[in-house]
């Protein structure tokens, strides 16, 4: 008589705060233990809180009432400011709380006073963790968070008398007893490329565990699965030898994304004309789109088109120095090394700017091409503007598309999106890279289930 297969344990429940479109949740839902890759999810998002309507609609389209995967109950999506949110019944039973309090206040890209006000949102995260009392909490943020007053306040909250005194912070990877405080804090920085992302994106990841959790072992940060290629390494050196177990793989290059996108037609400059009613936000919103719908272009001015054409592989704004261009009657662009090309009767214009020409250092990524053979730079919310960073296609005369940015972040082809082009770009750029979220999920699963 066949022995019946034991019932799988109940999924580990997750509450996602400042959830955005659900990148962190997607990473957790994608995790499967080794040997159970074909089984159902082991993590289940029960609730999410997000104040942005389009992002909340996207979350609902993937994990709420409009989700395609019905193997798990729908997450409750709360569209409201977190300051006024009181944990709902399902949230009060979450095993894990994850979230990244809005990071713009900590970011070097935002030095406005309003950033300081947004930094206080981390206190709301602490308030909710103290109320829910999960087994594990995870805070994700930019690297500057580790030097902020808010981080030091967090360290105080886990001490006796603090709101989180029932918790202890997990030592960061590589921590040594001899580390200085500053050295220890730097170890909280994880690079998504070390965990299989095709993007070099460093994020502060701070994990806390409740002192009453009954586990056979301590929670540890996930081991890295990929390492940066040394300057002297070759592809051949990465090939495994028979009978010899290899260590981590080399960082994944962004090439796979562009090999994929070149097989898809670049369709127009707009999203499909589609709207849907999302009950969680009680509105008709643009969508529901899939990642496949996001491969559209832009309508750049002639100057931008000329710059895209003139910048070589691996190049950036510095390659525009001493370059001029003309626009033919048919709209064609010609590039010249002189302001007075012989036989040219159309107006000749300079490609660079005085500001760019006068600065040999800094902003090296401006108007830069992504490099083949390497991971992408960090995908931010305005990746569709090469003036903002290294966001030109590696070889084509255009910026990367929303599709390519989403795939660089690790979103699956069937991920569902709501909102305008700008809304979706913001959702993509603010998300936690999916492979990084999955790696963190693996460490939590090992702690709670093995």
Task: Describe the predicted segments one by one.
Residues 21, 151, 203, 430-438:
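Short alpha-helical patches at coil-to-helix transitions and adjacent helical residues
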Residues 2-4, 193-194, 363-368:
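Generic recognition of flexible, low-complexity loop/linker segments
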Residues 6-7, 41, 176-186, 355-362:
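Intrinsically disordered, low-complexity acidic Ser/Thr-rich regulatory segments
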Residues 43, 198-200, 373, 402:
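A short, structural micro-pattern
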């Amino acid at each position: 008589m066949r022995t019946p297969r034991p019932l799988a344990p109940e999924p580990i429940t997750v509450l996602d705060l400042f959830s955005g479109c659900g990148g962190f949740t997607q990473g957790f839902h994608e995790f499967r233990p080794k040997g159970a890759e074909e089984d159902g999810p082991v993590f289940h998002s029960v609730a999410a809180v997000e104040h942005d309507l389009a992002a909340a609609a996207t979350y609902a389209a993937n994990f709420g009432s409009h989700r395609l995967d019905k193997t798990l109950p729908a997450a409750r999506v709360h569209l409201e400011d977190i300051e006024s949110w009181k944990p709902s019944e399902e949230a009060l039973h979450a095993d894990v709380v994850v979230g990244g309090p809005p990071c713009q206040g900590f970011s070097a890209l935002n030095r406005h006073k309003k950033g300081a006000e947004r930094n206080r949102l981390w206190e709301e995260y602490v308030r909710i963790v103290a109320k829910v009392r999960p087994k594990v909490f995870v805070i994700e943020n930019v690297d500057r968070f580790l030097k902020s007053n808010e981080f030091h306040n967090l360290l105080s909250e886990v001490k006796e008398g603090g709101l989180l005194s029932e918790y202890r912070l997990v030592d960061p990877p590589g921590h040594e007893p001899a580390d200085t405080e500053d050295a220890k804090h730097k170890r909280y920085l994880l690079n998504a490329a070390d965990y299989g992302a095709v993007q070099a994106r460093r994020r502060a990841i701070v994990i806390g565990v409740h002192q009453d959790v009954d586990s056979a072992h301590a929670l540890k940060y996930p081991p890295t699965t990929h390492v940066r290629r040394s300057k002297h390494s070759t592809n051949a050196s990465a090939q495994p030898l028979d009978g010899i177990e290899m260590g981590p793989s080399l960082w994944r290059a962004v090439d796979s994304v562009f090999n994929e996108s070149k097989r898809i037609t670049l369709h127009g400059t707009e999203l499909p004309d589609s709207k849907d009613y999302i009950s969680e936000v009680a509105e008709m919103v643009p969508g529901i789109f899939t990642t496949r719908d996001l491969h559209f272009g832009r309508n750049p001015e002639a100057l931008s088109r000329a710059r895209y054409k003139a910048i070589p592989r691996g190049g950036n704004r510095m390659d525009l120095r001493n370059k001029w261009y003309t626009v033919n009657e048919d709209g064609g662009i010609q590039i010249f090394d002189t302001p007075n090309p012989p036989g040219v009767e159309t107006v000749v214009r300079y490609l660079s700017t005085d500001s760019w020409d006068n600065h040999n250092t800094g902003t090296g990524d401006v108007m830069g091409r992504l490099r083949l053979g390497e991971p992408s730079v960090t995908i931010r919310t305005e990746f569709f503007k090469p003036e903002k960073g290294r966001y030109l296609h590696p070889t084509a005369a255009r910026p990367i598309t929303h599709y390519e940015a989403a795939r660089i972040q690790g979103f699956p082809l069937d991920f569902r999106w709501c909102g305008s082009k700008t809304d979706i770009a913001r959702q993509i750029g603010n998300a936690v890279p999916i492979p990084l979220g999955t790696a963190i999920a693996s460490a939590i699963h090992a702690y709670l289930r093995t």
